[in-house]
Curated annotation (Swiss-Prot):
Name this protein carries in UniProt: Signal transducer and activator of transcription 5B
PANTHER family in the cross-refs: SIGNAL TRANSDUCER AND ACTIVATOR OF TRANSCRIPTION
Residues recorded with modification Phosphotyrosine: 90, 682, 699
Phosphoserine: residues bearing it: 128
Protein origin, superkingdom: Eukaryota
Family: Belongs to the transcription factor STAT family.
Lineage, highest ranks first: Eukaryota, Metazoa, Chordata, Craniata, Vertebrata
Pfam families, per database record: SH2 (PF00017), STAT_alpha (PF01017), STAT_bind (PF02864), STAT_int (PF02865), STAT_linker (PF21354)
SH2 domain location: 589-686
Localization terms from the record: Cytoplasm; Nucleus
């Protein structure tokens, strides 16, 4: 069912909330008449922080205006006349409003659609059994909303009590003035004759005694009212503090944790809109109570009555100031983090947001935010409130930005779009620590006032740890530092402490999360894959994942010490696997055509009972980012064959699918899938031209093919009658009359015992590709394509 149809079925408060989303910035009539068109557009695909996306936003604005104009033109009849005028007016209005800022239209409609979906979900969940509540409306969120309702009612009650107290006090003051008037009348009695004076004096005395008795009683009542009201405020503040703790220390901290895990490839942290609505409700209720407390203080000053209320009010006033201070400083957050691997002299972006900016009217005098980079030690000093003013670790260009208020969404934020780290000052490193293990952070700070400069707040927030690099070759190791920090940092830590060791299952979870995100695949690491990785990391032969569950992995094992017998670390090897999959092999991994995480012996064990021509692809043990083909073909010389690993460089010349297509003797993808069934959809189409056909410039275009000459010879010697593409005649080149590009002596790609030695191997395929990739000499003799 369309979202707008469901939204129209909302009732009560949900309906009012939905209606409040619309106004002059986006009329509800536009939503109604263009509902289908609006819901079919890809609003979420536009990056609001990327100025280059402005073209897409402009196209959406133009499309919206055109659809409105079309809808207006189709209105006929008496009833349609007014609607035609109205829709035409809205088209002009939206064009004028968003013509210079089309991104704001996208932001506005995204905000509307998100909240409509939320309201519909909440309404549907409310009518469902308690056990089937959706994630958007958890039991905890229900409790938060119930507490807000309780706070609203309590605040209404104290407002009524305050008005009642004010009326009572005003009447008391009137009566007190009456008692003063009676005292003045006593002074005038001396002017009267004795008989009249005595008569008037008796009446005045009776009236005075009665009034003073009332005043004494009412003074006690007023004092009691004041104390009771102060006690109610104390209870309100206790509930407010508890609610604020849940929102800031639980919900907001959880959002920040999700944001950090998203840096490792976890699910997106989610919108801040719900959190902002809670923070705004907190701000509104806190401010209402603060104003009530101030009015109560004013009443006490207006009519001083000795008692404990002055001390109580001083306490609640200090408490509520602390509460609003904590709310203001804690809701100054980084909505979009800067990159955690930060290269100098490279543009980067970030967004900070104040969740209570709209409710506290901060946007009336927009504050400026400044970004600076500080070291780990400087961050520690900052949190200890030590003086770190002007103590920075580098220079950031374009590091100041004024916060902007977006009326449609009610957000106050600063978008840093063109920052660049000009230089970095590194600290002395400890022991074996490398530059890619040194952590920095971006400090965002600002100052703003609320309540007409009544309260002034200095706010600061730190980004997630960043590792600064100066060259792309450092990216791999810097990413390892970020991954470890994001995955294993503990709550409430001192910047930026992380455990030196973690359990293997914890690392498995982090690796799987990163793997799926980098490769952009739902096919993550299986139990068998994790066993292989554990064997590699711990240099173990156990095939049971449970055997590794209690084992710890140190940071040094992860990315400081090389693997046994290798010149690279565990992380560097794993990152190379992700890199080659992401750039060239993603569809094949998703198809399940790459087994990947098996060693040479395991590959042979898997192939031993398979028919000749069965092959599998596995990640190379010897070369970072390499993938090799292992296949079975029982010849006189050997049974298993292993091709020299391909890397990203090879696949940028010729794809894996085309390379496999060239090797006709590879028939089945392990375990038993026909090769062409798996890979044919990825083959590069071959033009239907005669091989001898000449191009316009007189040259013949060569073709690159994957060949394994030694295997051709071995398979022929074994009695194979197949005709291979690899056996096509090689081109000849002068000065040798018949230079054989594929010599018949034993080839270094495949060694005689079936083991591949990287150091002693020549990559024939690469040599051929490089040769064919050069400008053609006129002495090349073309041959027909086989």
């Amino acid at each position: 069912m369309a979202m707008w149809i469901q939204a129209q079925q909302l009732q009560g408060d949900a309906l009012h909330q939905m209606q409040a989303l619309y106004g002059q910035h986006f009329p509800i009539e536009v939503r109604h008449y263009l509902s289908q068109w609006i819901e079919s557009q890809a609003w979420d695909s536009i990056d609001l922080d990327n100025p280059q996306e402005n073209i897409k936003a402009t196209q959406l604005l133009e499309g919206l205006v055109q659809e409105l104009q079309k809808k207006a033109e189709h209105q006929v009849g008496e009833d349609g006349f007014l609607l035609k005028i109205k829709l035409g007016h809205y088209a002009t209005q939206l064009q004028n409003t968003y013509d210079r800022c089309p991104m704001e239209l996208v932001r506005c409609i995204r905000h509307i659609l998100y909240n409509e979906q939320r309201l519909v979900r909440e309404a549907n969940n409310g009518s469902s059994p308690a056990g089937s509540l959706a994630d958007a409306m958890s039991q905890k969120h229900l409790q938060i909303n119930q507490t807000f309702e309780e706070l609203r009612l309590i605040t209404q009650d104290t407002e009524s009590e305050l008005k009642k107290l004010q009326q009572t006090q005003e009447y008391f003051i009137i009566q007190y003035q009456e008692s003063l008037r009676i005292q003045a009348q006593f002074a005038q009695l001396a002017q009267l004759n004795p008989q009249e004076r005595m008569s008037r004096e008796t009446a005045l005395q009776q009236k005075q005694v009665s009034l003073e008795t009332w005043l004494q009683r009412e003074a006690q009542t007023l004092q009691q009212y004041r104390v009771e009201l102060a006690e109610k405020h104390q209870k309100t503040l206790q509930l407010l503090r508890k609610q604020q703790t849940i929102i800031l220390d639980d919900e907001l901290i959880q959002w920040k944790r999700r944001q950090q895990l998203a840096g490792n490839g976890g699910p997106p942290e989610g919108s801040l809109d719900v959190l902002q609505s809670w923070c705004e409700k907190l701000a509104e209720i806190i401010w209402q109570n603060r104003q009530q407390i101030r009015r109560l203080e004013h009443l006490c000053q207006q009519l001083p009555i000795p008692g404990p209320v002055e001390e109580m009010l001083a306490e609640v006033n200090a408490t509520i100031t602390d509460i609003i201070s904590a709310l203001s400083t804690s809701t100054f957050i980084i909505e979009k983090q800067p990159p955690q691997v930060l290269k100098t002299q490279t543009k980067f972006a970030a967004t900070v947001r104040l969740l209570v900016g709209g409710k506290l009217n901060v946007h009336m005098n927009p504050p400026q935010v400044k970004a600076t980079i500080i070291s780990e030690q400087q961050a520690k000093s900052l949190l200890k409130n030590e003086n770190t003013r002007n103590d920075y670790s580098g220079e950031i260009l374009n590091n100041c930005c004024v916060m902007e208020y977006h009326q449609a969404t009610g957000t106050l934020s600063a978008h840093f779009r063109n920052m660049s780290l000009k230089r970095i000052k590194r600290s002395d490193r400890r022991g074996a620590e490398s530059v890619t293990e040194e952590k920095f952070t971006i400090l965002f700070d600002s100052q703003f006032s609320v309540g007409g400069n009544e309260l002034v707040f200095q706010v600061k927030t730190l980004s997630l740890p960043v590792v600064v690099i100066v060259h792309g070759s450092q990216d791999n190791n810097a990413t390892a530092t970020v991954l470890w920090d994001n995955a294993f940092r503990e709550p409430g830590r001192v910047p930026f402490a992380v455990p030196d060791k973690v359990l293997w299952p914890q690392l498995c979870e982090a690796l799987n999360m990163k793997f799926k995100a980098e490769v952009q695949s739902n096919r993550g690491l299986t139990k068998e894959n994790l066993v292989f990785l554990a064997q590699k990391l711990f240099n173990s032969s156990s095939n049971h994942l449970e055997d590794y569950n209690s084992m710890s992995v140190s940071w040094s094992q992860f990315n400081r010490e090389n693997l046994p017998g290798r010149n690279y670390t565990f992380w560097q090897w794993f990152d190379g696997v992700m890199e080659v999959l992401k750039k060239h092999l993603k569809p094949h991994w998703n198809d399940g055509a790459i087994l990947g995480f098996v060693n040479k012996q395991q590959a042979h064990d898997l192939l031993i009972n398979k028919p000749d021509g069965t092959f599998l692809l596995r990640f190379s043990d010897s070369e970072i980012g390499g993938i090799t083909i292992a296949w079975k073909f029982d010849s006189q010389e050997r049974m298993f064959w292993n091709l020299m690993p391909f890397t990203t460089r090879d696949f940028s010349i010729r794809s894996l699918a085309d390379r496999l297509g060239d090797l006709n003797y590879l028939i089945y993808v392990f375990p038993d899938r026909p090769k062409d069934e798996v890979y044919s959809k990825y083959y590069t189409p071959v033009p239907c031209e005669r091989a001898t056909a000449k191009a316009a410039d007189g040259y013949v275009k060569p073709q690159i093919k994957q060949v394994v000459p030694e295997f051709v010879n071995a398979s022929t010697d074994a009695g194979s009658g197949a005709t291979y593409m690899d056996q096509a005649p090689s081109p000849v080149v002068c000065p040798q009359a018949h230079y054989n590009m594929y010599p018949q002596n034993p080839d270094s790609v495949l060694d005689t015992d079936g083991d591949f030695d990287l150091e002693d191997t020549m990559d024939v395929a690469r040599r051929v590709e490089e040769l064919l990739g050069r400008p053609m000499d006129s002495q090349w003799i073309p041959h027909a394509q086989s």
